[in-house]
């Protein structure tokens, strides 16, 4: 049984949702955790990524 009626259980709709999301929500979805030295320096755990940012893919 579905817990939340506003979230689709269809796989293709779930995959499409971040691409069709508004920019202020997509910004939160497309974020990456910062390294430990940057985390200590700036006090920010994760940062929204932009074009030309370098990220390390750890899974997926």
Curated annotation (Swiss-Prot):
GO terms for cellular component: large ribosomal subunit. Signal peptide: none annotated. One of its GO terms (biological process) is translation. Pfam families: Ribosomal_L26. InterPro entries: Rib_uL2_dom2, Ribosomal_uL24_euk/arc, Translation_prot_SH3-like_sf. Gene3D superfamilies: 2.30.30.30. It comes from the Eukaryota. GO terms for molecular function: structural constituent of ribosome. Keywords: Ribonucleoprotein, Ribosomal protein. Residues 1-43 are annotated as: Disordered. Residues 1-11 have a biased composition (Polar residues). SUPFAM superfamilies: Translation proteins SH3-like domain. Belongs to the universal ribosomal protein uL24 family. This is Large ribosomal subunit protein uL24. It comes from Brugia pahangi. The lineage of its organism: Eukaryota, Metazoa, Ecdysozoa, Nematoda, Chromadorea.
